[in-house]
């Protein structure tokens, strides 16, 4: 994206404050945070100017990235791969009575997630990765995806350590007898997350996952296998959703 296009996007999304922050970032470097007003006028969120946070903000709040049809009022939402928490914030404004567990492994992303969680108290930030084993994982610096995401490795020599949880760990640790919405955006780790889904999928009402087949072949197959028996499913680009209920019982 050219500098002019970037400035136009910052102005369109964030107004004059966005332009000023973007100009400051261009002169001084770094990624200054901006408290950006939400398009729905239901609060504000922190985003890092001159990063992919801006594109994610547009995707979530302007582009309708998570505007999937829902026939019930969710009480518990689990956001795996929450990044800085923009999808969690969208859910918080849309379902203010819901409890939202937001998990993010990358330290700088998690720091902004924690800031946003303070603005929306129903969001509970968790600094961890999610996979098929309870263990320690490592953020691999050799496979960067900007600020959008990271690649998790089991090799100690590859980067910063982070605790690794399974979905069953989350269910037990946070006392979640039911998960109404599970959102997964894990840069290819969907395969591992969904590997033992039979142990917990009965607890999930609706699951939506960004399937990064280009990073990890087999993600679509893993999702299809894990959601056998769901009553309906749909897809928007990389986002695949499956819902086991058509109407609230």
Regions found by a protein language model. Give the residues of each.
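Phosphate/nucleotide-binding beta-alpha loop and adjacent structural elements of enzyme active sites
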Residues: 1-249
């Amino acid at each position: 994206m050219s500098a002019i296009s970037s400035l136009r996007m910052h102005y369109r999304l964030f107004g004059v404050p966005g332009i000023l922050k973007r100009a400051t970032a261009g002169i001084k470097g770094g990624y200054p945070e901006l408290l950006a007003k939400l398009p729905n006028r239901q609060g504000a969120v922190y985003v890092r100017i001159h990063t992919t946070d801006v594109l994610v903000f547009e995707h979530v709040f302007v582009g309708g990235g998570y505007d999937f049809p829902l026939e019930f009022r969710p009480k518990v939402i689990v956001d795996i791969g929450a990044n800085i928490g923009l999808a969690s914030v969208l859910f918080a404004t849309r379902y203010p009575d819901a409890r939202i567990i937001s998990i993010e492994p990358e330290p700088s992303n998690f720091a902004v997630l924690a800031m946003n969680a303070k603005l929306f108290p129903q969001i509970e930030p968790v600094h961890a990765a999610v996979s098929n084993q309870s263990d320690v994982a490592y953020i691999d610096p050799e496979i960067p995806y900007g600020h959008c995401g990271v690649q998790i490795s089991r090799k100690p020599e590859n980067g910063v350590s982070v605790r690794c949880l399974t979905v069953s760990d989350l269910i037990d640790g946070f006392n979640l007898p039911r998960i109404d919405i599970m959102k997964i955006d894990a840069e290819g780790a969907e395969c591992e997350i969904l590997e033992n889904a039979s142990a917990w999928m009965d607890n999930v009402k609706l699951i939506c996952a960004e399937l990064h087949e280009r990073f990890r072949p087999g993600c679509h197959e893993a999702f299809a296998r894990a959601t056998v028996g769901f009553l309906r499913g749909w897809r928007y680009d990389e986002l695949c959703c499956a819902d086991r209920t058509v109407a609230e019982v």
